[in-house]
UniProtKB/Swiss-Prot annotation:
Molecular function per GO: peptidase inhibitor activity
Function statement: Plays a role in the inhibition of bacterial toxin-antitoxin system by blocking the action of host Lon protease.
UniProt xrefs under Pfam families: Inhibitor_I24 (PF10465)
Keyword tags: Protease inhibitor
Domain of life: Viruses
Gene transcribed to yield this protein: pin
Protein name: Host protease inhibitor
């Protein structure tokens, strides 16, 4: 059964989809973000996936391209093995890269290198800007992690009573 937030793996790539989205090749793992019913008036309307999120975070929506398909995949795609639900996703998780280089935080190492006497030109300024940007990104990730934890606690309070 196809539902939102379930993870699937592509077993057989659809050439029509690959013409528009080459990343939708066999082996690709994605999460369902949005569904649509083919014809609500039917007794058993077919459910189709119209928006997905890839493991790297990229969002793909059927309406982003001038494709003639009504959906990316449907219930028949699961039944015929074109895609399959992924129960265990631990090995598909995109790993966060290390934030250190030779034992130092990358942002610190860049700032230290930029501060050296011979790095007062373009390269030094670029390294300093990169260090500041990395620091900012790290604060955003930390904030996002805290928000996710708060959301999970609230969700558990309201729905797991």
């Amino acid at each position: 059964m196809i539902t939102v937030d379930k993870w699937f793996r592509i077993n057989r790539a659809d050439t029509g989809l690959c013409n528009y989205w080459p990343e939708l090749s066999a082996g690709t793992v994605f999460k369902v973000r949005e569904l649509v019913k083919e014809c609500e008036d039917d007794i058993e309307p077919d459910t189709g996936i119209i928006e997905i999120e890839l493991s790297d975070g990229k969002i793909i929506n059927i309406y982003d391209k001038p494709i003639t398909y009504w959906c990316l995949w449907n219930t028949e795609s699961v039944e015929n093995g074109e895609i399959e639900e992924v129960v265990e996703r631990t090995n598909q998780v995109v790993q966060k890269p290390k934030a250190d280089f030779q034992g130092e935080r990358i942002s610190y190492a860049l700032a230290k290198l930029a501060a050296q006497e011979n790095n007062d030109g373009y390269e030094g300024n670029l390294m300093q800007a990169a260090a500041e940007y990395i620091e900012w990104l790290e604060t955003q990730i930390s904030f996002s992690d805290r928000m996710i934890q708060q959301y999970k606690r609230l969700h558990q309070m309201f729905y797991n009573t």
